[in-house]
Amino acid sequence: MRALVTGAGKRLGREMALYLARRGYDVAVHYAASRKEAEAVVKEITALGRKAVALRGDLLIESQVEKLVPMAVQGLGGPLTVLINNASIFEHDTVATATRKSWDRHMESNLRAPFVLTQAFAAQVPAPRLDDHGEPVASGMVLNMIDQRVLKLTPEFMSYTLAKMGLWALTRTAAQGLAPNVRVNAIGPGPTLQGARQSDESFVTQRGATVLQRGANPADITAALGFFLDSAAVTGQMICVDGGQHLGWKTPDVLDFD
């Protein structure tokens, strides 16, 4: 079993790459700028007895994106069965401040690159095997890391949100178009890891403001990944691992109701 995880040098990408290795996968660890971190992940995976390669690619440059799946196949020694589109740009803009640059950066990284990778991945996935009932079992799975905010829209992070909305649509339409060979699912994380520009107080407040009054931990994300890996009959679905953040209902009109 072989997997490609984009943005796997740090944070949730790293956690998912290591989880896959513990599940018996050889892993291609993609990175853009985090070379040392990606190489460290490769060492951790090889220490677990699995094969791993670090692959550099700028997801804003399509010619580099197009090379990632072939390089992963070559580096790991065979076809991939899992693709995790994890790498993402998350920069603030609004309908008033968005520029062509902010639009293109988010669309290329967060939507176009996953689309191109999904095309290449699907083209090399082996034919599905038949189970004991004579029914096909998909040989490949794509997991898109989206965001709970696609179910709870706000006017903030406009270009980012629109790209993730597109990725959510891609998840469902690709699930239709690539069946029965490939399943396509998604995870919508909420507050899981503290952002680089986020204060400790802000992070604690954000986690506590969810319906469950807690955020998610990396183990919650990998548990959702594990569910999708094990669930041959599940495709086109998103699990929000967010403490119920997308269900938030305590808005001023409700709080002021007497």
Question: How should these model regions be labeled?
Answer:
Residues 129-179, 191-192, 245:
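Catalytic loop of short-chain dehydrogenase/reductase
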Residues 23-40:
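Conserved glycine-rich Rossmann-like NAD(P)H-binding loop of the short-chain dehydrogenase/reductase
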Residues 20, 79, 168, 178-192, ...:
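Conserved Rossmann-fold SDR core element
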Residues 1-28:
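Canonical Rossmann dinucleotide-binding motif of NAD(H)/NADP(H)-dependent dehydrogenases/reductases
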Residues 94-95, 99-107, 206:
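Substrate-binding pocket helix/loop in short-chain dehydrogenase/reductase
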Residues 86-91, 244:
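Conserved NAD(P)H cofactor-binding loop of Rossmann-fold oxidoreductase domains
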Residues 217-241, 246-247:
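C-terminal substrate-recognition "lid" of short-chain dehydrogenase/reductases
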